[in-house]
Structure formats: C-alpha cells, structure tokens
C-alpha cells in the first residue's frame, strides 16, 4: 500500500489502468496527472518467489506525456520488467506477456 500512497502524494487521482494476477505474478499500472498538469505513470510488479519486487517507478518527463502516452509507457514498462525476469515460471511469464500484448494492441495501432 505504501507504493500506491506514494503515487497519491505526487499526483492527483491515480487511475489503475492494468491489474492482473497470473501464477505468482501480481502487476498493476497506474496513470495520474501531476500537479503541473503533465501525465505520469507508475507500476507495481511483484513476483512472489524469493521476494523479487519492483517498486513503483514514477516517471517524470519534462516534455510531458499525454494521458494516452502515459498509458502506453506504463504498459511498456511492465512488459520490459516481465521480460527481464530470469527466475520465473516461464509458462506464467508467457501468459502475462500475452495479456500485456492484448492490452497494448489497441493503443499501439
């Protein structure tokens, strides 16, 4: 819960845009409008096997992101994190990547 509170402190009204549990994976992506009016994103990606945790990474772009841009970047960040995990169940990892791909399709094309 601390991570979600961190986003709330920095941005107003964070919105969960993606939330899935697959096997030992639990991932969530958020977007929020920062006080300066720009859109930021954050994500939580937990893999419960040995306590591997990726905390919220709130991104700030000086040029700013559109709301849709923040959505795409959040999903890409989770995809990248999941792909780089070495010590995971490959079947669960593949399933989660498929879900992410399906979620990204309408936003990429």
Model-derived features: positions:
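Short linear sequence elements within intrinsically disordered, low-complexity coil regions
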Residues: 9-11, 23, 44-52, 86
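Short aromatic-glycine-(Arg/Gly/Cys) micro-motifs in beta-strand/loop hairpins
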Residues: 32-57
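Periodic aromatic/glycine/histidine/acidic cluster detector
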Residues: 26-32
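Negatively charged, low-complexity tracts enriched in Asp/Glu with abundant Ser/Thr
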Residues: 1-26, 106-109
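Mixed-charge, Lys/Arg-enriched low-complexity segments
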Residues: 3-4, 50-109
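N-terminal cationic amphipathic segment used for targeting or macromolecule association
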Residues: 27, 41-43, 68, 72
């Amino acid at each position: 819960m601390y991570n979600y509170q961190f986003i709330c402190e920095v941005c107003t009204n964070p919105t969960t845009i993606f939330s899935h549990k697959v096997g030992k994976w639990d991932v969530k992506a958020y977007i929020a409008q920062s006080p300066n009016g720009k859109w930021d994103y954050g994500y939580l990606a937990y893999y419960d096997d040995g306590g591997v945790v990726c905390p919220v990474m709130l991104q700030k772009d000086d040029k700013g992101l559109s709301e849709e841009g923040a959505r795409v970047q959040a999903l890409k960040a989770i995809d990248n994190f999941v792909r780089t995990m070495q010590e995971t169940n490959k079947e669960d990892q593949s399933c989660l990547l498929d879900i992410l791909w399906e979620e990204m399709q309408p936003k990429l094309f």
